[in-house]
Amino acid sequence: MHPTRSFQGLILTLHNYWAEHGCAILQPYDMEVGAGTFHPATTLRSLGPKPWKAAYVQPSRRPKDGRYGENPNRLQHYYQYQVLIKPSPPNLQDLYLGSLKAIGLDPTLHDVRFVEDDWESPTLGAWGLGWECWCDGMEVSQFTYFQQVCGIECSPVAGELTYGLERLAMYVQGVDNVYDLNFNGLEGDEKVTYGDVFLQAEQEYSRYNFEMANTETLHQHFIDAERECEAILKAGSTGENSLHKCVFPAYDQCIKASHVFNLMDARGVISVTERQGYILRVRNLARQCGEAFLLTDAGGFNFKREGE
C-alpha cells in the first residue's frame, strides 16, 4: 500500500521503517491526550537510564483548535506519529531523513530545511532542544532532544520525532483539504476519504467543546483527578511497597486532569491568572509521577549501565 495514495498507507510505511530500525511498534494510548508526548511510552520512558526505542500513532485532542469541520487543515482531533529513542543516536537526523524518503519525500528532490524551534510542554514540565522540519516551505514534522521531562533532567538525553500525519499526508497526496485525503487507497465507490471517517465527529466535538461541555462538571472532574493521582502515589510511598507506587494508574489521572483543563480552556471559563495556576497543578502531578517512576524497575531503579 503506497504511502502517497492513502492515509493508512502512510502510517503502515512509517511502522515498517521504524520497526526495521529497532523500534517496538506500540499501540495508541487509550486516554484523551493533547499530543503524542503524553503517551507514557514517551513521558515516563524518557526518564531514567534504561534504553528505550518505540514508535506509535497517537490520536491527539486539542479542543480549542476545533473549527466545526469548516477549516481545511485545522482540527480538534488529529493524529501524530511519535518516535522515541533513548539514548538519542548520533545519526537521528539521518534516520529521520530516511523516513521521509520511505514515504515518498526524497530529500534530494525537495527543499528540506531544519528550522530551530526549541520545544516546551508547560503542563508536563518538559522542554528540549528542537528543530522543525520544513519541506518546500511547509512544516511537516519536528524533532527534539529532551532535556527535561516532569521537571526531571533526562540522562541520557532521548531523541523524539513527531510527525503531523494529516499535514504530511496532505503534502504527499497533493490535496489542499484534509477531508479530501484518500484514507484507504481505493478509488470509485470503494474509496474512503478522511472526511468520510472524521468530518461528522469533528463537527460534533467542536460544538461540544465550545458550547455544550458542562463547566461545573469539568471543574469537579479536575479536582477528582488531581486528588486521585496524589492518593494513588501516596498509597505506595511507604513500607514494603516503596518500589511499587502504581505509577501508571496515577499518571492516567494526571492525563485526565490535563484534558479537562484543555476543555475548560476551550469553554472560555479560565482567566489568564487561573490558567497559570491550573498548568502548575498539572505540572506538579506530572513531577510526582516522574519521581515515582524513577523508583521502579521500569524507571531504572536497579539498572546498571555498562561498565558500572
UniProtKB/Swiss-Prot annotation:
It is an enzyme of class 6 (ligase). The keyword DNA damage does not apply. One of its GO terms (molecular function) is ATP binding. It comes from the Bacteria. GO terms for biological process: glycyl-tRNA aminoacylation. Keywords: Aminoacyl-tRNA synthetase, ATP-binding, Cytoplasm, Ligase, Nucleotide-binding, Protein biosynthesis. Its main location: cytoplasm. It catalyses: tRNA(Gly) + glycine + ATP = glycyl-tRNA(Gly) + AMP + diphosphate. It holds the Pfam family tRNA-synt_2e. The keyword Metal-binding does not apply. One of its GO terms (cellular component) is cytosol. Its EC number is 6.1.1.14. It is found in: Cytoplasm. Belongs to the class-II aminoacyl-tRNA synthetase family. PANTHER family: GLYCINE--TRNA LIGASE, CHLOROPLASTIC_MITOCHONDRIAL 2, GLYCYL-TRNA SYNTHETASE. Tetramer of two alpha and two beta subunits. This is Glycine--tRNA ligase alpha subunit. It comes from Brucella abortus (strain 2308).
